[in-house]
Every structure is written in structure tokens, then in C-alpha cells.
Amino acid sequence: MEIRNIKTIKGLFFTCACATLLIFANCGGGDDPVAEEPTLTAAAANALLLDKDWSLSSATNAGTTRDEWTGFTLKFGIDSDLAGGTYTASGIPAEDTDKLVWSTSGTFTASSDLTTLTRNDGIVMTLVVSETALNVSFTVPESSGRVDGFTGAWVFKMVP
């Protein structure tokens, strides 16, 4: 009878050991943490939004619509450090004085969030960009020797 008790005790011990292993194997750890998607900085988000060919929707100078800019397009190239870049403009009206508002290409330095760009000609542009629109506003100062009618506040509304 002692052998039978020993076998029973061994069986119970083995069963308890297996149950303990199953319990502890499924404990702890919890859910694996979900990797959060990195949040883009304002500059990085704006750089992605600006990376399009933009076509003119409307242009105004001192609140007056300027129809001669129909066909104007703009493309920005943002440097990898997001501190500046280049722009290329096409469809600039044939009038020589219109080239004083935009040159066909140039460079710029950028604010930390890419909402203010300072062109290489010294013009400071304010940008408001979304997936579907870009508004570029700037002032051409009279003191720069620009031709009358091309100074003042300009607003270029663009679409991709």
C-alpha cells in the first residue's frame, strides 16, 4: 500500500507542477506596448505639404485682383535641415516689372516652422499651407526702388 501512496503522491505532484507551469507561463507581460507613430514637427509637416507643384488660383496687389498672373506656378524645394531651400516660379507675366514681384528662381531661409520664408532678394513671405491650398503673402516695399503698381501687399492663392 505504501507504493500505491507514493505513486499517488508523485502523480499529484506532477499534476500540480504542470498546473503551476501553465499558470505562470500565461502571467505577466501584459499586452505588448503599441509603438506610437512619431509626431512630425511643424516644419516637417509643412515641408511635406509644400512638396507639390502649386498653380495660381488668384493674385491680388493691395486688394486689387491681378489677372495678368493667370498661369503662374510655384514649386518649393526644402533643404533636408528644413532651414531653407529653393523656389522655382513659372508663368510670370511678360511685363519686365512683374519680374520684380517674383523671379523665376531663388533661394530662401525659413522660420523654424516653415511658415515664414525670407527670399534671397530680402522679401519676407508668410505661408499658410494645407493639403488643398497655399496662400503666400508678402509686401514689396517702395524703398527697394520697385516700379509703382508693384509695391505693396501681395497675396498669391495657390492650389495643387
Describe these PLM feature segments.
Residues 28-103, 111-160:
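Lipid interaction determinants
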Residues 2-14:
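Bacterial N-terminal signal peptides that target proteins for export
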Residues 23-26:
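C-terminal motif of bacterial Sec signal peptides marking the signal peptidase cleavage site
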Residues 15-16, 51:
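Small-residue packing motifs within transmembrane alpha-helices
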